[in-house]
Amino acid sequence: MLLALLLTMLLYASLQAQENSFTINSIHMESRPSWEVSNGQKLTLQCLVDISTTSKSRPQHQVLFYKDDALVYNVSSSEHTESFVIPQSRVFHAGKYKCTVILNSKEKTTIEYQLTVNGVPMPEVTVDKKEVTEGGIVTVNCSMQEEKPPIYFKIEKVELGTKNVKLSREKTSNMNFVLIEFPIEEQDHLLVFRCQAGVLSGIKMQTSEFIRSEYVTVQEFFSTPKFQIQPPEMIIEGNQLHIKCSVQVAHLAQEFPEIIIQKDKAIVATSKQSKEAVYSVMALVEHSGHYTCKVESNRISKASSILVNITELFPRPKLELSSSRLDQGEMLDLSCSVSGAPVANFTIQKEETVLSQYQNFSKIAEERDSGLYSCTAGIGKVVKRSNLVPVQVCEMLSKPRIFHDAKFEIIKGQIIGISCQSVNGTAPITYRLLRAKSNFQTVQKNSNDPVTFTDKPTRDMEYQCIVDNCHSHPEVRSEILRVKVIAPVDEVTISILSGNDVQSGDEMVLRCSVKEGTGPVTFQFYKEKEGRPFHEETVNDTQVFWHHEQTSKEQEGQYYCTAFNRASIVTSLRSGPLTVRVFLAPWKKGLIAVVVIGVVIAALIVAAKYYFLRKAKAKQKPVEMSRPAVPLLNSNSEKVSEPSVETNSHYDSQNMDVEYTEVEVSSLEPHQENGRLP
């Protein structure tokens, strides 16, 4: 009902406003007490509006408050001033504020006003325990409920009565609190924890003052360890030495700490199930030194040290020998002695084997006698051992054998292995390989197994092995190993001795050669487009010749040759082509010219004769056709063929008296003649 009444009033006011004229003269904001306030201070933001209207009553308008362009308060009013109240200002209230007035379709907004809130409220700090044992954990809770996260927290662990910060932790939380664990160290006694909070205002961080927690009392988990030495006064070698380290443990402790006794850095005794650790040993002078007792549990460690001095009963024995390096067959002499020459029991040992129970020991050295020797001297319960002395007995090397691993002939450029071996002799053995009497390689071998050198010989080569070891005898040489190297055929060429142009009838000599190749080499001569060689020859040389006595045009063309030997990787190598041209001798050319000219002349004579005969026949034909037929004297098979015979018959007046008329016949052109004659 109330809502309906309110809507009716607003509608009425709106209608009234539409009927009346109005204008928004001005609008601005004010902050009470100011635009810069302290944290927690009450703040009132006012929006002041000046409106002119023709209405007798004030028009109803809407006032909106914005912070950083976000609406924070909205009210409808007819008053000139409207307020937005913040009871306790905080850092998150800081920002840029403005207000807007809306009256019907008219609207006006103020400029932006910067509100600054100075200071940060004090945080609260609590601890989860007020008493803690060394090695424990204290959880600190630092909170600030007034401000909005993210909030920056800084917590410090401080020893009461000092200004030294023992540990500091920082964390930015998206909540209003933070929980941070602090370990309790052995140097901690009475602690307080300080907390500081910070809030980001724009680009500036505003921080609070430090606030301190309640006191936290630290109890010792265990005390500093203490030493007890027995016997308490002078300790002589042979006495039983007892070193005890003890510690006091807090009654709240749920387990014992670990107790460690060290001499220098070596651990000599430990205990994990007791309040003490004991190191007991028969005293020797080497037990003198600094002893440290450490008590450790998690992060807690405490230690104390003591110096122990032990009086020497007699010095350590010394083992002397004739030489530390002997040739096999020489005498090995060992002697054990103690300074001051006290009465003692002696033994001489090789590793763990007792060789003698006297001060001296001698024998003929063999290779198996190599090893570490020592001696002992004992007085009462005290037994001391000398330093270890190395002895090496060298067996002389046997003459080395030398051999290579090639199963077939060695081809130039291939890798071969040259092996050397001395079957007998003390290792390590130094092998030195000579190649062509010059040092090639040196290798040391720790056994009598063969040693292998690799090489790529390019020609016949001699190898020799030299071996040496610890023996005093001079180095030993092997026999000389001779290696024969065969070279494959390389660069086949073909040439002609008389030049590429050969005169017909002369001798033609072709030469096929290789740059390199171990014989025997097989050469083959080919003519282009012929599948089989026309000449083949195998020689122990790098070249071969082919002779042809009488050269003719048949020998003209392109030639090539091939060559191969047993070292050839491919079947054969082929030369490039050689072009041979055959030309005629000058006298042959002249003879041919004479013959040709003679043939031409003969042909011309025959042609001329033939021509004149034809012409004569052509003249005679019309005469024969114009005279009467002449009786045949012979049978029908006889013919009158010669014009001279016919002429004679005309003048034979005795046989026949005939009148005739001479007719002059003009000569015809050959084509006309052929056209008219049958």
Swiss-Prot record:
Protein's GO biological process = angiogenesis; bicellular tight junction assembly; cell adhesion; cell surface receptor signaling pathway; cell-cell adhesion; cell-cell adhesion via plasma-membrane adhesion molecules; cellular response to mechanical stimulus; cellular response to transforming growth factor beta stimulus
Instruction: Find motif (ITIM motif) and give its ranges.
Output: 658-663
Glycosites? N74, N141, N309, N345, N360, N424, N540
Please give the residue ranges the record annotates as the region Disordered: 634-653
GO terms for cellular component: cell periphery; cell surface; cell-cell contact zone; cell-cell junction; cytoplasm; external side of plasma membrane; extracellular space; membrane
Q: Which residues carry this modification: Phosphotyrosine?
A: Y660
Compartments, record wording: Cell membrane; Membrane raft; Cell junction
Per UniProt, what is the membrane topology? Single-pass type I membrane protein
Q: Which InterPro entries match?
A: Ig-like_dom, Ig-like_dom_sf, Ig-like_fold, Ig_Fc_receptor, Ig_sub, Ig_sub2, Immunoglobulin_dom
Sorted alphabetically, the keyword list is: Cell adhesion, Cell junction, Cell membrane, Disulfide bond, Glycoprotein, Immunoglobulin domain, Membrane, Phosphoprotein, Repeat, Signal, Transmembrane, Transmembrane helix
Cystine pairs? C47-C99, C142-C195, C245-C293, C336-C375, C420-C465, C512-C561
Q: Does the keyword rRNA-binding apply?
A: no
Q: Where are the transmembrane segments?
A: 590-610
Q: Name one GO molecular function term.
A: protein phosphatase binding
Q: Which residues lie on this side of the membrane: Cytoplasmic?
A: 611-678
Notes on the domains: The Ig-like C2-type domains 2 and 3 contribute to formation of the complex with BDKRB2 and in regulation of its activity.
Q: What does it do?
A: Cell adhesion molecule which is required for leukocyte transendothelial migration (TEM) under most inflammatory conditions. Tyr-660 plays a critical role in TEM and is required for efficient trafficking of PECAM1 to and from the lateral border recycling compartment (LBRC) and is also essential for the LBRC membrane to be targeted around migrating leukocytes. Trans-homophilic interaction may play a role in endothelial cell-cell adhesion via cell junctions. Heterophilic interaction with CD177 plays a role in transendothelial migration of neutrophils.
Name the record gives this protein: Platelet endothelial cell adhesion molecule
Organism for this UniProt entry: Rattus norvegicus (Rat)
